[in-house]
Curated annotation (Swiss-Prot):
Protein name: Transcription antitermination protein NusB
InterPro entries given in the database record: NusB-like_sf, NusB_fam, NusB_RsmB_TIM44
Region of interest (Disordered), ranges: 165-189, 201-227
Acidic residues: compositionally biased ranges: 178-189, 201-214
Lineage: Bacteria, Bacillati, Actinomycetota, Actinomycetes, Mycobacteriales
GO molecular function: RNA binding
Biased composition (Basic and acidic residues): 215-227
Organism listed in the record: Corynebacterium glutamicum (strain ATCC 13032 / DSM 20300 / JCM 1318 / BCRC 11384 / CCUG 27702 / LMG 3730 / NBRC 12168 / NCIMB 10025 / NRRL B-2784 / 534)
Amino acid sequence: MSERRQDYKRHGSRYKARMRAVDILFEAESRDVDPVAIIDDRHKLARDTNPIVAPVAEYTETIINGVAVELDTLDVFLAEHIAETWTLGRLPSVDRAILRVASWEMIYNADVPVTTAIVEAVEIASEYSGDKSSAYINATLDAMASKVETLRERAANPEAVLAEASESLDDAPVAPWDDSDALDDSDEDFEAVDAAEVFEAEETVEVSEVAEDSEVSKVSEEKADES
């Protein structure tokens, strides 16, 4: 594990909840499944006698449920503000997940200061993607922050947002990430945080994991057989 990963211990539970939300959104897109279903699966696995995953924090679940409900509106807003040289569908999926978490907090969670949502997103991007991703994520969220009150007003009428969205907007995800167009810091650099190293001394924080299809399917099948 890199030294930068170990520094991640210094953050509070909200930061860790955001990171786990990013992990779950990334996994959901990679596996083409509902992120809410992943949350339900994690809850079941965490209740096992010998759990292989940590419980999902309440704030992680709040983020996932919020993003799942408002995904179309969030993607319209992100597509409107992303740097002209990029489209939402062509970004690494982990960067899309980071942008969706942060934009949901900025627009739908009044308890989180806009600046906090941006700073946390940029730092998560530096953990998972690198400086290049951090830069355009920061620029995109800053652009949204300058119009956040307008975006909140528009978000109150999602049907109108979707109706007004131009056909040219990139409704992500449109296709698997194209390596030929990838940033230097692509999805290949995204790795799960080692739960044992990161959280061994903490009881209430979240474990960041992106489970592979085979592992999750195997556990789920075993539990189904036992029941």
